[in-house]
Amino acid sequence: MNKSLSKTSVAVVFLAVLGCAPNAFAAEPVTRLQQAASQPAPGVQHPAWKADELQRIIKADDLKVSPFREDGVTFGTPTWIWCVEVDGKLYVRAYSGTSSSWYSAAVREKAGRIIAAGMTREVTFAPEQGSVNQRIDEAYSQKYSSSPYLQGIIGEQARSATVVITPKAQ
């Protein structure tokens, strides 16, 4: 590859591979490429939360998620949700299940930001359907034991909408 190729030239090549005309520099294809480039490749480990940041988020219990909108640039409306920590990872669930608008956006866009404990962090979102869900149920049960909403968040509808939130490298 010629090292003198500009970023624009590379974008044109990628757009051509995706089936877009080189003069079709619409915001969405470029944004999707930029977003994909910011994601770790499949099988590559995501950066972990710093222990102090994760504990501040869990303790504050004021997490708001803002997955990107369909344009891949605009953050969605911050939505307050419960969160738990299991094995150093931050998990959330959509109480109303996979039809929840924030959940749908998080799974579709795979990125956005969170606001919690006085911090704003760009993050990735990934659905979690593995065996860790039993431990996530236990973490929710322990943290929110006095809430009348506990049974809903550990029920099958919410469990099917479990998301792991990972910080993007800073």
Segments from the language model and where they lie:
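Short, conserved active-site entrance elements at the starts or edges of catalytic domains
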Residues: 27-76
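Bacterial Sec-dependent signal peptides at the C-terminal "C-region" and cleavage site
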Residues: 20-28
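Extracytoplasmic
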Residues: 58-60, 78, 87, 109, ...
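Short beta-strand segments
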Residues: 61-96, 124
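Short, structured beta-strand-loop surface elements
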Residues: 29-47, 97-170
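Bacterial N-terminal signal peptides
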Residues: 10-21
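Short secondary-structure boundary/capping segments
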Residues: 54-55, 82, 153-155
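Bacterial N-terminal signal peptides that target proteins for export
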Residues: 2-12
